[in-house]
Amino acid sequence: MLLADFLKQSTSRLTKLYGEQEARAIINLLCKARFGTSTYTHIVEPSYKVPEDTVSEELQRLEKGEPIQYVLGFAEFMGQRFRVEPGALIPRPETEILCCEAIKYAKLKTRTINILDLCTGSGCIAWSVATALPNSRVIGVDISEKALSIAQNQNFKIPNPPSFIKGNILTDNILEGHKFDLILSNPPYILTSDKARMQTNVTDYEPEIALYVPDNEPLIFCQAIADLSRRLLKQDGIGIMEIHEELGNQILNLFKNKNFENTEIIQDQFKKNRFIRYSRSSE
C-alpha cells in the first residue's frame, strides 16, 4: 500500500477516538517506528509503499484505545528511548522540566551528588539524571514490583546506573541513615473524581496506583514527601516534585509550614503550575 494511503486510512480509524491531529501524530509515530519513515516521506516520495499487514494487529490495539507507547513498547524522554509497558506510567514531556532543573542544580556542585527519585515508575527520571550526571549516585523507590522490574531493566549502559528499591513512601521508614542532595518525585496527584473526565487511553491502561489520590486526601503524597525530605534531604539540598496544577498554593503552604525554604512553583511549557521546588532550612 502507498504510504500516503496508509496514513489517510489509519488516521481515519483513530480520529473518532483522538481527533484528527492527534490521530495523525500517533500514526506518524507508528510509521516511524515500524517502517522507518518520517513525517514527510509520503510527500517527497509519493510512490513509497509500506507492508501494512505487519502493523494490522498494532492498529487494532490503537483502535481500542491502547496508548501508542505501550503498543510500540517504548517512549521518548529526555532524548532517550525508555522501555514502557502496562504497570508503569508513560513518561510525559512536561516531566522533562523536572529533570532539567535537577541537572542544572547538580552541575553547580563539584562533589558527587546523591539523588533520590521517589515514585520512580519506569525509572525515566532516575535514568535521565544518572545519564546526565555520571558522577552521581541515584536511588529510585517505588511500591510496585512491576514498575521496579521495568525500571531496573532499562537498556542504558552508563558508568553509575541507578539502583532501585521497593518501598511505600506513605508507611515505610525508607533509607534510614541516608542523606541526599536532591529529592525528586512525580507522585500520584490526580483526584479520583477527575477520572471521569480523562481519556480512556489513560484510565483504561495506565496503572491507577501511579495516577490517583483520594478526593478527601489530595495532598497525601505531598505530605509524605515533605516528611521524608525533612529526614533525608541535606541542609543545602533541594527537592523538586511534580504537582497537580490546581493545588499549587496548598502544596506551597504545606512545605512552608514544614519550614522548608526557597519554596516556589515552576510552570511547565503550557504555563501551568506543574512543579514545586524547595530546600532545607538551616536549622
PLM region spans:
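Conserved hydrophobic residues forming the short capping helix/wall of the S-adenosyl-L-methionine
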Residues: 14, 106, 155, 229, ...
